[in-house]
């Protein structure tokens, strides 16, 4: 699912393409794409409205319309937005079309049909329950600490909770925890002030870098102006079996809170207080004792503990991951071609 950097990239690509245009009509090909409104009422609500701006809140795109109303677009798993000419080739996966007054149209393409589009008036606040924006100036270390210390959950599910902080998903939660050297099963209450500061810094640093690199084009994500490149700079996400960039030990993959989670069990130590309860014991049973707590230097075979040439098993894992990335890139290219984008 596209996260903050990917959605921000789509917003930045979309804004100059459609800002100032007027919506002439809307055609809905999959009624469930709409959130709480019928296709007829949606078309009536957007027809004749001028697009005043495009922004983002968390993982959702906000299209501001004249008259004070606005659209929200949640891409979910496979949602894509393209701006093409109205006489462009048809595509069976296009779920909704906004016809513009200049001969172009905005197409919402969504293979798995999970994406949602809503229409709201100025008085509505569909984002009331969403947490603060992690890249905003208001998201200070003090704010982060206060919110963190009010929670008792484990770090990985906590970072995915959109009421805690907006926009972080599976990719950047794994990356931030690895960069901060914090185990995904660690609980918020066990963090020291230095841990809190490190996690806050890494969340902001990694998200900012990902925005600059146009996000991670993994699976079906692509933006109107093309793919991102952050996927080539991820340290642990979808790299199970590959060597940890810090210590050379293989990256582990487990399921935490129903989500695939990638981490280094040697670099990201789990305190004894966090090894029992809350599902941790079940997950840890799949790991050896050194993997649970992280290996000590004395337990490493000679020559290990540093990054070096990958072993055969890791080479296989790396090759498999590369094939997966290439297949996803092929799907994204096919999507752009199918809509004439």
What are these regions (language model features)?
Residues 71-182, 187-190, 194, 199:
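Phosphate/anion-contacting hairpin/loop surfaces
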């Amino acid at each position: 699912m596209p996260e903050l950097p990917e959605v921000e990239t789509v917003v930045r690509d979309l804004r100059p393409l459609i800002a100032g245009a007027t919506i002439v009509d809307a055609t809905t090909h999959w009624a469930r794409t709409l959130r709480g409104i019928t296709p007829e009422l949606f078309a009536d609500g957007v027809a004749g409205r001028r697009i005043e701006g495009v922004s983002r809140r968390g993982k959702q795109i906000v299209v501001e319309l004249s008259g004070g109303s606005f659209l929200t677009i949640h891409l979910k798993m496979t949602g894509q937005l393209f701006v093409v000419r109205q006489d462009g080739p048809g595509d069976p996966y296009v779920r909704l079309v906004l016809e513009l007054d200049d001969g172009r149209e905005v197409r919402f393409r969504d293979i798995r049909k999970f994406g949602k589009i809503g229409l709201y008036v100025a008085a509505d606040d569909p984002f009331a329950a969403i947490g603060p924006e992690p890249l905003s100036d208001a998201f200070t270390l003090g704010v982060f600490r206060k919110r963190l210390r009010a929670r008792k959950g484990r770090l990985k599910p906590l970072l995915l909770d959109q009421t805690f902080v907006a926009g972080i998903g599976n990719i950047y939660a794994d990356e931030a925890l690895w960069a901060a050297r914090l185990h995904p099963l660690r609980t918020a209450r066990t963090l020291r002030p230095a841990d809190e500061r490190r996690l806050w810094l890494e969340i902001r640093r990694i998200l900012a870098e990902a925005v600059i690199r146009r996000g991670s084009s993994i699976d079906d994500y692509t933006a109107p102006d093309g793919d991102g490149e952050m996927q080539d700079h991820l340290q642990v996400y979808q790299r199970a079996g590959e060597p940890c960039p810090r210590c050379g030990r293989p990256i582990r993959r487990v399921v935490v809170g129903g989500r695939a989670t990638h981490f280094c069990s040697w670099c990201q130590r789990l305190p004894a207080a966090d090894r029992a309860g809350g599902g941790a014991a079940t997950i840890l049973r799949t790991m050896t004792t050194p993997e649970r707590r992280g290996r000590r230097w004395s337990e490493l075979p000679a020559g290990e503990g540093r990054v070096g040439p990958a072993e055969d098993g890791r080479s296989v894992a790396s090759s498999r991951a590369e094939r997966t990335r290439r297949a996803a890139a092929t799907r994204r290219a096919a999507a752009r071609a199918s809509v004439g984008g």
